[in-house]
Structure formats: structure tokens, C-alpha cells
Amino acid sequence: MEHNDVKVGLSVSMSGKYRLQGQQALNGVSLWQSHTTTQGGIPVGSVTRPVRLVWYDDASRSGRARENVRRLLQEDRVDILLGPYSSNLTLAAAEIAEEQKKLLWNYGGTSDEIFSRGWKCVVGISTPASDYFRDLPGWLARQNPELRRICVLYSGKGTFGGQVSRGIIESAQEASYSVHSVPLNDPSSNPDLVLSTLRELNPEVLVLAGNFQDELAILQTRSRWPNTVRIIAAVSGGMAAFGSQLGQASEDVIGASQWEPGLSVSPTVGPSSEWFVDAFQKEFGPTPGYVSAGAYASVLIAAECVRHMGSTDNDALRSAASQLNCNTFYGRFQIDRPTGKQLGHRVCLVRWRDSAKTVLAA
């Protein structure tokens, strides 16, 4: 490859527990690459430079993600570094990015912990974890005001589940709900613990905040839950694979989604949602989910900052990102300047019925 290529690099989970989301992310970035290539590349100053994509499988492991990021920065010398999927892997990648003073464009790690360490290298694209279900108590108050008891089962591993739990606890307590938060580890290997917890608390609203596999394992025991449970919400309910993998057990489950094809957004940067969905389906087949959309949006935003500054210099791109306030098909982009935490983007609540997701009114 010629030295003037703009190299885009990422550590991505093509194996291990995040392989589904990793493939979705890679599809999103690959679509951006192919579309940008048809346009001749990225404008950098007075020259339009071709793009090159470099990625390595991290096998859903933090240690491998660190190795991959170090390789991307020291050997491949990428110009744009994208983060992996999952908060744990993003924390690992960000450690190396901060050490190497390289900006990390983060679509897939949403734990608030990522933005609380004083790092200057992370630019968040997606809504932070603590806001995933922050609007759920308000929705419940309008739709089911008689329900007052909420139980949050969250993953005790890592920081993501605890941050989701914190957000809903704060908003539920403000609305005078009774709320219990219970950490769980490996529920698939101990389903009786989940059942005993539910039978002890008898919640009316159950919220799950874990990884995809753990939430599926819990929901597969749904027929044995106490009949007090009237409303179910799960972080993974925002993913397209949720319904196909759970079948009837997904019925009426509420999810949190970073993006849905039907959302009305007028982009000021990049293509429309309609274009993205159509192009993605032509390239890969299925309708894209929010992981693919977020990955595409992250490199779209990075490229916009390159175009605006006429440079791939790290400090210049951080300055551009701090000043940028725009809409892409993925939603609004505006970060907190000191931390890089995303402020403008919003999640939406969705509900599964008849194997399909619908967006709930805000």
C-alpha cells in the first residue's frame, strides 16, 4: 500500500462470546470503507486520500485487545483507531491508546467508567450505560402506574451492568418506586439462583443488565418465574438477534437500542438511515442493528473531523471532535469536552411483539 493511505484500524471480536457483535461491527466499518472508496477516499487538506482497513481478532479477550491495539499503533501506524465492542475490551484498548497518545473512537464500550479515569484519548459515539434505562420509570408511570416494585439483575463482572443498574435506580427512586438491585455472575450455570431471587422479591418489573448470553439464559427460565412479573426489560433486547434466538420468550420484552432503522433523523453529516439500511442489506443481507450502525457512525465522525481539520494529527482531531455538534443517521453527536463522554446521543426503548421490534414513544 502507498504511504498516503488513511489507515483505519480496530481490534474486533471475530471469536469468543462477543463474536456476533464483532461481526456486526466489522460489517458496519467495511460498508463505510467500500462507500468511501467509491467516493475516492477521505479529503485531507487539498488531497483526497484512499482508505485502508486493518483489523485483528481479539477473541473477546482483554489481553488480546491490548496486544492488537499496540500492534495497530506501533506496527501498522493507523491514522484512525476504532474501539472494540464491549466495555471491558474498550477499557483495555483505551489503556494502550492513552499510553500511546492516540485517539480511540469508541462506539462499543458504554460503561461510564471509561470516561471517569481522566483519559483524553477516548471519543464516545454512543449513549453511556447509565442512561440505557433511565427513561424506563417515566414510561412505566404513564403506561402501568399501578406497578411499583422493580428488580434489577445485573452482571457483577466488569462495570457495564452496574452502571446500567445505577441509572435506573436513580430515576426509579426519584419517581418513588421500590427498587432492588442484585448482582449476578454466570446465571446460565446457576439458574436456580435467579429463580430464588425472583421468588423472594416478587417484583412487578424485572430489568436485566448483563451480556447477551447471560440475559438469554435468564429469559429462557421465564416460564418458571413468579406471576407477579408483569414487565420485563433487557439490555440485549435492543439487538436484532434477540428475537430470533429467544423465540416466544422474547414476547413483550422491552429493550434499549442505540439506533433503529425507523427513527427519524435528518443528518447533517453522512448518509440517511434509508441509504444505510439499503446499502447494508445489499452487501450483507439482514437489516442492520445498532452495533453495525454505531461502528459505521464512529468512523464517519472520525473522517468528518479529518476533513474539517485537513489533518490526521491526533490533537487536531480531538479538538475537532470537541467542537463538533452534528447529526448523523445514528443520531446526534456532541461530547463533553474534558472527558469525551457522549452527551448528544439518546437511546430509544423498543418492545418485541410477534418476533419484531417496535420503538416505544418517548
Task: Tell me the role of every PLM-derived stretch.
Residues 279-292, 303-357:
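Segments of small-molecule ligand-sensing domains
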Residues 21-25, 42-116, 186-191, 216:
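Beta-alpha junction/loop-to-helix N-cap segments that form part of ligand/metal-binding clefts
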Residues 3, 9-32, 56-62, 153, ...:
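Extracytoplasmic "Venus flytrap"
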Residues 65, 124-149, 190-191, 215, ...:
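Hydrophobic alpha-helical segments within soluble ligand-binding/sensing domains
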Residues 57, 114-138, 250-259:
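Short beta-strand elements at the ligand-binding edges of bilobed clamshell
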Residues 223-294, 357:
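Extracellular/periplasmic periplasmic-binding protein-like sensory domains
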